[in-house]
From Swiss-Prot:
Cofactor: a divalent metal cation
Entry-linked InterPro entries: ATP-NAD_kinase_N (IPR017438), ATP-NAD_kinase_PpnK-typ_C (IPR017437), NAD/diacylglycerol_kinase_sf (IPR016064), NADK (IPR002504)
Localization terms from the record: Cytoplasm
Protein name (database record): NAD kinase
Residues annotated to bind NAD(+): D67, G68, N141, D142, R152, D171, T182, A183, Y184, S185, L186, S187, Q241
Domain of life: Bacteria
PANTHER family per record: NAD KINASE
Gene3D superfamilies: Probable inorganic polyphosphate/atp-NAD kinase, domain 1, Probable inorganic polyphosphate/atp-NAD kinase, domain 2
C-alpha cells in the first residue's frame, strides 16, 4: 500500500469535510497516512521539522483545493520526487485532475497504481543582491518582477545568458514555465505553450512600448532580470506568494530547475482538450 499525505486549503468551504471523509475512507482500507491532515498554510509557511521529515517518506500527496493549493504543495514535493494529484475545490482547476464528485472512484485507481505520471518543468529563481546570491526558490508557474502596489512603472533590464535583450519600462516582467503560460502570462498577452515543450517565456506586463513582445527562450538558457529604476519599489514573487522587495541593482536569475513536478493523471484528456474545457468554463 502506498503511504498517502492529504493537504487541504481550509479557505475552501468543502475542504475540511472532504478531507475527513477521505481520511475515514483510507483508514477503512488500511491505507497508511504518512502525515496528519495538513493545511497548506502550515505546510508552506510554518512546517515543523517532524512534518518535513514525514513529508519525505510519502509515496503520493492528494491536494484538496484549487490550482493555488496544488502549486504550493508541488514546490515542496518536487525536490523529493513525490507525485501529486489535485482534487478541484476551486473554480477552473487547470492543474487539478479529479472533481470532488469523482474522488473515491479516483482514489480506488490511485491506490491500485492505475495511473500515469506527467512531469512538468519547473523554474528555479535566485535573488542576487550586491553580487551575493540568496537562497533559491522553485516555481511551477512563474517568477514575476513587478511594481507592486506603487503607481509608477519600473525599469527592468532583461538578459538571456550574457546578452542583454531589452530594457523594459513596464508594470513588470513575467518569466513563466510552459505550465505557467496559461496563468498570469496569458492575461498579460503571452502565448499558450504546451507543457510538453520545455522553454522559458518572458512576458512584459503593460509595457510602455508597442514593440515590447513576449519571448520564448530555450530551456538551457537562464534569464536575468535586473531592476534599474532609481525609485526602489519593485517586488519579486514566486507562484503568486508574498513578494520580496527589490532595490535598484538587484537581479533575479531564473533558469530551468533540476527538479520537476510529478502530476498523477488518470484520464486520457490532452492538454488541448483541458484548455478548451477550462477556457469555455471561464467565460
Amino acid at each position: 500500500m502506498p503511504t498517502v499525505g492529504v493537504v487541504l486549503n481550509d479557505d475552501k468551504p468543502q475542504a475540511l469535510e472532504v478531507a475527513r471523509r477521505m481520511a475515514d475512507w483510507l483508514s477503512q482500507r488500511e491505507v497508511p497516512m504518512g502525515i496528519p491532515l495538513t493545511r497548506v498554510a502550515e505546510l508552506v509557511h510554518s512546517p515543523s521539522p517532524e512534518l518535513r521529515d514525514r513529508l519525505r517518506q510519502l509515496d503520493l500527496i492528494v491536494v484538496l483545493g484549487g490550482d493555488g493549493t496544488l502549486l504550493n504543495t508541488a514546490r515542496l514535493a518536487a525536490p523529493h520526487g513525490i507525485p501529486v494529484v489535485g482534487v478541484n475545490l476551486g473554480r477552473l482547476g487547470f492543474l487539478t485532475e479529479v472533481e470532488v464528485s469523482d474522488l473515491f472512484p479516483a482514489l480506488e485507481r490511485i491506490i491500485a497504481g492505475d495511473y500515469r505520471i506527467e512531469e512538468r518543468m519547473m523554474l528555479e529563481a535566485r535573488l542576487i543582491r550586491d553580487g551575493l546570491e540568496q537562497p533559491s526558490y522553485f516555481a511551477l508557474n512563474d517568477v514575476v518582477v513587478t511594481k507592486g502596489d506603487h503607481p509608477r512603472m519600473i525599469r527592468v533590464e532583461a538578459a538571456v545568458g550574457d546578452e542583454v535583450v531589452w530594457t523594459y519600462s513596464a508594470d513588470g516582467l513575467i518569466v513563466s514555465s510552459p505550465t505557467g503560460s496559461t496563468a498570469y502570462s496569458l492575461s498579460a498577452g503571452g502565448p499558450i505553450v504546451s507543457p510538453e515543450l520545455h522553454a522559458l517565456l518572458l512576458t512584459p506586463i503593460s509595457p510602455h512600448a508597442l514593440d515590447a513582445r513576449p519571448l520564448v527562450i530555450p530551456q538551457d538558457q537562464a534569464v536575468r532580470l535586473t531592476v534599474i529604476s532609481s525609485h526602489s519599489h519593485a517586488v519579486v514573487t514566486v507562484d503568486g506568494q508574498p513578494g520580496q522587495p527589490m532595490v535598484c541593482g538587484d537581479s533575479v536569475l531564473v533558469r530551468k530547475a533540476s527538479v520537476a513536478c510529478r502530476l498523477i493523471r488518470l484520464g486520457e484528456r490532452t492538454f488541448f482538450r483541458i484548455l478548451r474545457e477550462k477556457m469555455q468554463q471561464g467565460r
